[in-house]
């Protein structure tokens, strides 16, 4: 390997790690190219990667050493790329989109010249809009699909408008999630009866979200199953019952805060949705949304 080429590659890899999270990398050929352009506009965090002859990977070691609170939403602009995750492999071409989970290992291959945009989509945003589903990754959304074309246009318009406010950037991300909904659906392998049972459970949770009695034992009794079966049902979807309930309460709190009057007490909102301890409410809210309830309110004012 030409030392000059290897040195240039290591510098580019260092840039990738600073902006996109930890990756290991190797050259597939000495005919390597690598350019990274970043774009941060309020809530939008994205990178344009132009490269060829490169393989980047995230093993469990890299995952543990970096922020995993994101999904990489990959918009292919030109050329081709191969993405691997969860024992799936997909080849994407110009105009296609795919999704990769930053919390799990993945591998990316660019044999020939390729240009793509990677948009960091917050995990909490996906969970807010799709609380009952586990996103499927390394799945190609074809460029011919109207919603894919709309997503590309929305991304380009957002990038070309540096004056977007925090609220407008947040709205753009929310619109992106809605447009990409098909790729965020987990293709279920379970029997229809089991899926209907799961939907019954999550509906029961939402209908009783403010009640103190809302615990796994009560839910199991109301839906005619054992607590163990309830836990297993949620685990099959990558969920934990108690955490799911807490996150749903926090999602309702966040929505209430966005629409609350300026003089409405934040502690009162938390209490209304089942958080009797103000300090605990502030702590878990920040864990989920990256800011305190007060900071969250100011963000939407």
Curated annotation (Swiss-Prot):
Gene Ontology molecular function terms on file: cis-regulatory region sequence-specific DNA binding; DNA-binding transcription factor activity
Keyword annotations from UniProtKB, A to Z: Activator, DNA-binding, Transcription, Transcription regulation
Residue ranges constituting the HTH araC/xylS-type domain according to the UniProt record: 199-299
PROSITE patterns in the record: HTH_ARAC_FAMILY_2
Residues within the DNA-binding region(s): 217-238, 266-289
Keyword DNA-binding in annotation: yes
Keyword field contains Transcription: yes
Annotated InterPro entries: AraC-bd_2 (IPR035418), AraC_XylS_family_regulators (IPR050204), Homeodomain-like_sf (IPR009057), HTH-like (IPR037923), HTH_AraC (IPR018060), Tscrpt_reg_AraC-type_HTH (IPR020449)
GO BP terms: positive regulation of DNA-templated transcription; regulation of DNA-templated transcription
Pfam family, one: AraC_binding_2
Described function: Positive regulator of tynA/maoA and feaB/padA, the genes for 2-phenylethylamine catabolism.
UniProt name for this protein: Transcriptional activator FeaR
Native species: Escherichia coli (strain K12)
Organism classification: Bacteria, Pseudomonadati, Pseudomonadota, Gammaproteobacteria, Enterobacterales
Gene name in the database record: feaR
